[in-house]
């Protein structure tokens, strides 16, 4: 039976995301566990187009975009020290973390 921990990180700022992945990877490597990643997932770009003027000048528009960056980390055969190290990692405020535990049979 092989267990895995999948950690998905999401952020609007790629610099804070890369810093968070470095902190997680170094914390896991201190426990001598095997880690795969960081695997960069496709970024999602949402674009919004709005009129500059509320009344006339339909051709005058402004465009905005939001870029969502994502990374994936996979830890193979985690031990209790890995879970303890992950709970003590302090990450930046703009990084969203989703942790999944996968048990293989």
Curated annotation (Swiss-Prot):
The keyword Ribonucleoprotein applies. Belongs to the universal ribosomal protein uS10 family. Gene3D superfamilies: Ribosomal protein S10 domain. Part of the 30S ribosomal subunit. This is Small ribosomal subunit protein uS10. SUPFAM superfamilies: Ribosomal protein S10. The keyword NADP does not apply. The lineage of its organism: Bacteria, Pseudomonadati, Pseudomonadota, Alphaproteobacteria, Rickettsiales. NCBIfam families: PRK00596.1, rpsJ_bact. It comes from Rickettsia prowazekii (strain Madrid E). GO terms for molecular function: structural constituent of ribosome; tRNA binding. Involved in the binding of tRNA to the ribosomes.
């Amino acid at each position: 039976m092989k267990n895995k921990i999948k950690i998905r990180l999401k952020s609007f700022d790629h610099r804070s995301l890369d810093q968070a992945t470095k902190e997680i990877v170094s914390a896991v490597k201190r426990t001598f566990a095997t880690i795969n990643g960081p695997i960069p997932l496709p970024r999602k770009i949402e674009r919004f187009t709005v009129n500059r003027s509320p009344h006339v000048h339909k051709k005058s528009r402004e465009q905005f975009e939001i870029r969502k960056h994502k990374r994936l980390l996979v830890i193979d055969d985690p031990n209790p020290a890995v879970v303890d190290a992950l709970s003590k990692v302090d990450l930046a405020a703009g990084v969203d973390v989703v942790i999944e535990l996968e048990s293989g049979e």
